[in-house]
């Protein structure tokens, strides 16, 4: 029966420990985004809608060109609901406070406190209550400061949309500005530059419409949207050129579109809609500290009954033995672990906040230090998410100012909405040359862009009798209307040989990840009247302008620093492999063999896990491909970070041990992340890694000290209990000693850390902790036994009448040795000489040691059942402590050479 009870107790503790020790639930957190794949039915629906003609669209969504009337809207709202994404509600403060309290250590101490109170040991009960209260309140305060309850999904889209509705019984239609939650399937929406897409839409009218959907697909350049699909065989809904998806935005142009999905039925809604349905799994930090904590709790649960049995049997007073065993249990419980962990992590968060980094989840600090693989999106994360003019060359690939200035005139004089490429061209010419071009050349006319021609032209003049037509557009479309080429300053025919040369140059640019636009000209006699499309013929190909989304300035040094810190960087992007490989080259990463999304789809988990370990660049990935790769790398035993800024990154951010987002990220990505970088510099990543390793090292100091001290103390108690006719220390003494020791450890979060402890990723290792206990615990027991001998034979405290002297002597030795151990095992070096603790820790340990020595001489000595120690005791005390420190240093040297030092 006892065996079953113990098994059930361990099961309960193990079930609750991973999340409740450091991470509170259920605070509002987009990390709970469901990882379930997008349903096939939704993908098929999108593809069907994309292929429909206009009449089929009206029938499918029970709509009509005049818009919906009030009755139809009410019916559809009843059928489909409001256009809202489900969001998780923040928990009230008292639920958060309760979750801060209910970790296994606090629950265990509460039970011990109740037992102490029921036995009228009020002091012990008060001390335990103080420990539990401090730990709980500190956790609550620190996490309340660190966690911001934000409704990311509601902030994801714009507040209103322009909708065509029937406004009266006569059937009169009017464009209305309505809140987006009132949109229903079948509504007709007007789009213009700058608008966020308020629902999933099918385009029915479009003029020069470009939509930025990098947040969904990772593609850095805006994509064209048209009324009739150019690719009827398209199988990826996100690449359908007749569909727009919620959460993306219009870059340029205008359109009318019909709503075909709203709220949780949208593509974005499927990614985000299961926020409250699934609980995120414990990350590496939670799993590690769970295993370590269970080791310490098991040790306490095993040793306490042994102490009870030995004392009860040898002393014959089972009640006194029970009280003593209870005090031992309190002493063996690492009650300060939650507070030390939280305060250490919180200090790291405060230090990072000075670097303009928001730490939303405290355990992310340690995961930063443990991370050995960083997977990162490309667009907007490593890159500037801004199109710049990278090259301007003639047809042979040589840099050409003529081509640049010609392209500038085209972009400058067009009257349509300028897209990102035009903006990049205009910014590519300095102010003075641009002013000179504008003064020399006057606009005559233009031929606007359309998607059939995929080019646009302006006509300018420098002399009264000559006009120049400048045409800019997609390479193939320009070649279709060109007959000549400007080559080495001469005008030559565009023959097959020249065409092969052109292809070689442009293919090279494409392989470099550049988007190539061709520029051509034509000289015409001056004339009156408008120019037409037919004038775009017999053009002279001048050269090319090529564009790129460049890396941030800090990307290359940041990735180099991460690599030097033992972290492997992998790129996971939805963009093309050519563009991604170019960025990898720019930032100093060897892309190697690129793996694309279709390959990921074809592999099973074992094959993909093996491939993921040796692959640096993954391209053309869907959101769930990224999540799958991150999950499989975690399965292989890695601590994985993911850095991204788009909707398509949210599942991977949630799946990673540490999610990192950057400035300018969409709200859903910021909410899914644990860490948010508020500045463009990525160098703070290195600082975060170092801070994570520093906090881990300081947490490990407390755990090592607690584990080794507890092991040694229990061994000493067992030896003393077996041979002494009285208790080696009263329960009250154990509680006071434990309280003073805990006070000395409050300064651990402020301690220094040796350089070698932050060079490589640091992880929890329960096996190493167990070995550490066995090596260092008995050292203190050796000197405890020497103290027993000293008090018994030298000071003759060997009868029950003299037990107070015996207990006072061991109280001082035990407290001082336990307090000094922090300086011995906080470093593998020689303490105080090669490595010195931070001043707060030195001051706290000195203070506790002074208090411990003074208590037997203080007015409280009688109440505490201590007595003044003879002066001859103190030389022995110094010798014992010196011997203890010397032997510990010797064992430490052997241990670090044999097993290493965390």
Predicted ranges, named:
Residues 1-184, 189-197, 202-210, 214-221, ...:
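Non-lumenal N-terminal regulatory segments of integral membrane proteins
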Residues 82-114, 147, 234-243, 274-302, ...:
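Soluble-to-membrane junctions at the N-terminal ends of transmembrane alpha-helices
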């Amino acid at each position: 029966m006892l065996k079953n009870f113990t098994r059930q107790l361990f099961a309960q503790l193990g079930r609750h420990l991973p999340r409740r020790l450091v991470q509170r639930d259920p605070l509002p957190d987009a990390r709970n985004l469901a990882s379930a794949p997008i349903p096939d039915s939704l993908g098929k629906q999108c593809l069907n809608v994309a292929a429909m003609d206009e009449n089929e669209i009206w029938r499918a969504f029970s709509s009509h060109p005049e818009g919906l009337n009030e009755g139809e809207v009410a019916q559809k709202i009843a059928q489909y609901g409001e256009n809202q994404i489900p969001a998780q509600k923040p928990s009230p403060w008292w639920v958060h406070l309760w979750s801060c309290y209910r970790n296994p250590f606090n629950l265990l101490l509460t039970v011990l406190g109740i037992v102490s109170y029921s036995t009228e040991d009020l002091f012990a009960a008060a001390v335990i209550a103080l420990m539990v209260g401090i730990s709980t309140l500190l956790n609550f305060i620190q996490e309340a400061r660190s966690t911001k309850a934000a409704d990311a999904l509601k902030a994801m889209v714009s507040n209103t949309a322009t909708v065509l509705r029937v406004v009266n019984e006569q059937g009169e239609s009017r464009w209305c500005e309505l809140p987006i939650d009132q949109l229903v399937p079948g509504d007709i929406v007007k789009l213009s530059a700058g608008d966020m897409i308020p629902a999933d839409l099918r385009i029915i009218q479009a003029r020069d419409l470009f939509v930025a959907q990098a947040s969904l697909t990772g593609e850095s350049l805006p994509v064209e949207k048209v009324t009739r699909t150019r690719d009827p065989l398209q199988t990826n809904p996100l690449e359908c050129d007749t569909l727009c998806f919620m959460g993306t935005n219009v870059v340029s142009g205008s359109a009318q579109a019909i709503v075909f999905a709203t709220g949780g039925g949208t593509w974005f809604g499927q990614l985000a809609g299961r926020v409250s349905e699934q609980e995120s799994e414990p990350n590496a930090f939670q799993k590690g500290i769970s295993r370590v904590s269970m080791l310490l709790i098991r040790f306490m649960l095993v040793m306490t009954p042994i102490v009870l049995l030995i004392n009860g049997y040898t002393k014959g007073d089972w009640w006194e033995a029970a009280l003593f065993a209870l005090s031992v249990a309190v002493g063996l419980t690492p009650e300060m672990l939650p507070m030390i962990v939280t305060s250490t992590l919180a200090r790291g968060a405060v230090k990072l906040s000075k670097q303009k980094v928001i730490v939303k989840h405290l355990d992310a600090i340690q995961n930063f230090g443990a991370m050995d693989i960083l997977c990162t999106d490309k667009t907007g994360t490593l890159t500037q998410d801004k199109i710049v003019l990278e090259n301007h060359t003639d047809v042979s690939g040589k840099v050409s100012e003529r081509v640049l200035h010609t392209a500038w005139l085209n972009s400058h004089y067009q009257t349509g909405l300028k897209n990102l490429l035009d903006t990049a061209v205009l910014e590519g010419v300095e102010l003075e040359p641009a002013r000179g071009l504008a003064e020399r050349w006057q606009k005559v006319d233009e031929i606007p862009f359309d998607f059939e021609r995929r080019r646009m032209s302006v006509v300018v003049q420098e002399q009264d009798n000559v006009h120049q037509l400048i045409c800019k557009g997609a390479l193939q479309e320009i070649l279709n209307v060109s007959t000549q080429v400007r080559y080495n300053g001469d005008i030559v025919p565009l023959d097959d040989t020249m065409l092969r040369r052109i292809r070689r140059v442009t293919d090279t640019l494409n392989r470099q990840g550049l988007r190539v636009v061709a520029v051509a000209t034509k000289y015409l006699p001056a004339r009156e009247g408008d120019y037409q499309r037919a004038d775009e013929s017999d053009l002279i190909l001048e050269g090319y302008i090529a564009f790129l989304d460049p890396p941030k300035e800090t990307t290359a040094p940041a990735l180099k620093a991460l690599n030097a810190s033992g972290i492997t960087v992998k790129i996971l992007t939805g963009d093309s492999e050519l563009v991604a490989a170019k960025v990898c080259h720019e930032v100093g990463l060897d892309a190697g063999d690129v793996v694309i999304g279709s390959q990921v789809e074809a592999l099973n988990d074992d094959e993909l896990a093996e491939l993921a370990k040796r692959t640096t660049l993954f391209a053309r990935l869907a959101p769930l491909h990224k999540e799958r790769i991150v999950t499989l790398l975690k399965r292989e035993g890695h601590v994985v970070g993911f850095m991204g800024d788009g909707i398509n990154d949210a599942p991977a951010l949630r799946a990673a041990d540490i999610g990192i987002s950057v400035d300018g990220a969409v709200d859903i990505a910021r909410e899914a992340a644990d860490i948010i970088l508020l500045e463009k510099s990525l160098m703070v990543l290195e600082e975060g890694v170092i801070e994570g390793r520093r906090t881990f090292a300081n947490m490990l100091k407390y755990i090592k000290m607690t584990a080794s001290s507890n092991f040694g103390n229990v061994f000493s108690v067992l030896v003393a209990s077996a041979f002494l006719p009285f208790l080696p220390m009263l329960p009250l003494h154990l509680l006071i000693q434990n309280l003073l020791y805990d006070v000395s450890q409050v300064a651990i979060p402020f301690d220094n850390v040796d350089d070698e402890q932050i060079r490589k990723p640091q992880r929890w290792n329960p096996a190493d902790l167990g070995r550490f206990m066995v090596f260092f615990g008995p050292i203190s027991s050796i000197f405890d036994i020497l103290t027993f001998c000293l008090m018994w034979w030298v000071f003759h405290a060997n009868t029950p009448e003299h037990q107070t002297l015996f207990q006072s002597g061991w109280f001082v030795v035990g407290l001082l040795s336990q307090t000094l151990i922090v300086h011995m095992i906080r470093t593998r070096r020689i303490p105080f000489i090669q490595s010195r603790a931070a001043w707060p820790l030195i001051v706290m340990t000195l203070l506790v040691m002074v208090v411990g020595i003074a208590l037997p001489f203080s007015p409280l000595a009688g109440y505490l059942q201590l007595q003044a120690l003879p002066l001859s005791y103190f030389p022995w005390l110094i010798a014992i402590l010196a011997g203890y420190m010397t032997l510990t240093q010797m064992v430490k040297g052997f241990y670090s050479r044999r097993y290493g030092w965390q």
